[in-house]
Amino acid sequence: MRKGSVKEVLAKIKYDPRENEEDYFIIIEHRGSYGNVRKIPVSLIELGHGYFFVGETQIPYHRILKVVRKDGRVVWESRKRGLK
């Protein structure tokens, strides 16, 4: 877990032909959602420089709390305080 930046991990998932982006989702900090988090399939995001996009919504990478496989294995997790 946690090898490289979240952007590097997402780029590998999206662009490495050995990976299937349909097998992954991200959990982001999203105020107003249940538990203040939101789950987004990696297949729905586009990577940018300091942000990623879900449709036309721009979201900073620092909002990502976890990158998780469908089987529940966490492949990247934020070092934010208090994250369980």
From Swiss-Prot:
Listed name of the protein: UPF0248 protein PF1300
Top-rank taxon: Archaea
NCBIfam families from the UniProt entry: PRK04257.1
UniProt cross-references to HAMAP family, sorted A to Z: UPF0248
Family: Belongs to the UPF0248 family.
Organism listed in the record: Pyrococcus furiosus (strain ATCC 43587 / DSM 3638 / JCM 8422 / Vc1)
Source lineage: Archaea, Methanobacteriati, Methanobacteriota, Thermococci, Thermococcales
